[in-house]
């Protein structure tokens, strides 16, 4: 990092050229502001406010999901399970948006999302009742429960992949077994009703699998042609590759070289549109 020092009369102005930050994942934004110690015999620093010089680090995590869960708790008049350190005012606004939910999901619930639980809400009297809360700020991408963004170790254990596989070998495994993996991702995502909220579009939907004669409709992924974006472009898979059906994106795999995470996210709204007979969607 290069420092530029400019002196104007008795006032010393220190400006720092900041490196352009690397693009971070959507769900984590790190904002850092710091002023490095400047050592120059011509620059006086004894009168500089120490609060300005002291490095600060502010971490803004993906909080929409937590606010959404709090809003549901407020709507149903139940306790939020865990620590909540986000805006109650914004949660209240979301609660007002959820008004019609109780008309279509009239169950007594308890909040059960703590510690990465598979279900965000469970029936208080009937524990077979489950509800998953899914949010997106704008792009419509959501992760499956449990295995949506695991470490390499957890991914390998879950899919019975050799832990010694390199990331390139894991990519090859995904390409060769994508239909089987989508079956698993699908089952973990839609094993209970989903309350989906797209903040930018103001889309609020209760989504569940269509039930015909007591059986939930599913998708036979083995009969569907799935295309990877990097293959369509005749390029190698670097970090991200989307999967599509008839040129419509339905999901995305992300494998970063410098992060211990093998991530999959559904293009949720596209998935609902491509398979309309598979889902029952109630717009709220």
Segments and roles (model prediction):
Residues 1-9, 30:
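Primarily low-complexity, compositionally biased regions used by nucleic-acid-associated proteins
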Residues 7-12, 45:
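Ala/Thr-enriched low-complexity intrinsically disordered regions
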Residues 15-35, 39-284:
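Nucleic-acid endonuclease domains
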């Amino acid at each position: 990092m290069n420092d530029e020092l400019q002196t104007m009369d008795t006032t010393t102005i220190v400006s720092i050229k900041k490196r352009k930050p690397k693009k971070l994942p959507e769900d984590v934004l790190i904002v850092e502001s710091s002023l490095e110690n400047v050592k120059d015999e011509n620059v006086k620093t004894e009168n500089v406010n120490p609060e300005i010089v002291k490095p600060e680090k502010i971490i803004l995590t993906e909080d929409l999901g937590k606010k959404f869960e709090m809003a549901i708790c407020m709507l149903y008049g139940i306790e939020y399970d865990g620590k909540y350190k986000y805006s109650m005012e914004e949660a209240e606004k979301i609660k007002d948006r959820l008004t019609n939910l109780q008309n279509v999901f009239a169950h007594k619930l308890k909040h059960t999302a703590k510690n990465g639980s598979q279900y965000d809400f469970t029936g208080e009297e009937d524990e077979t009742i489950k509800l998953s809360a899914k949010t997106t700020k704008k792009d419509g991408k959501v992760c499956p429960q449990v295995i949506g963004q695991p470490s390499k170790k957890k991914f390998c254990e879950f899919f019975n992949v050799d832990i010694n596989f390199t990331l390139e070998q894991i990519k090859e495994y995904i390409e060769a077994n994508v239909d089987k993996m989508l079956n698993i991702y699908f089952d973990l995502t839609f094993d209970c009703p989903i309350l989906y909220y797209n903040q930018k579009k103001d889309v609020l939907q209760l989504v569940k699998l269509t039930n015909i004669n007591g059986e939930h409709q599913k998708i036979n992924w083995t009969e569907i042609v799935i295309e990877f974006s990097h293959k369509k472009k005749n390029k190698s898979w670097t970090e991200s590759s989307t999967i599509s059906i008839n040129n419509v994106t339905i999901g995305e795999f992300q494998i970063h070289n410098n992060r211990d995470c093998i991530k999959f996210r559904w293009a949720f709204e596209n998935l609902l549109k491509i398979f309309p007979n598979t889902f029952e969607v109630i717009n709220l």
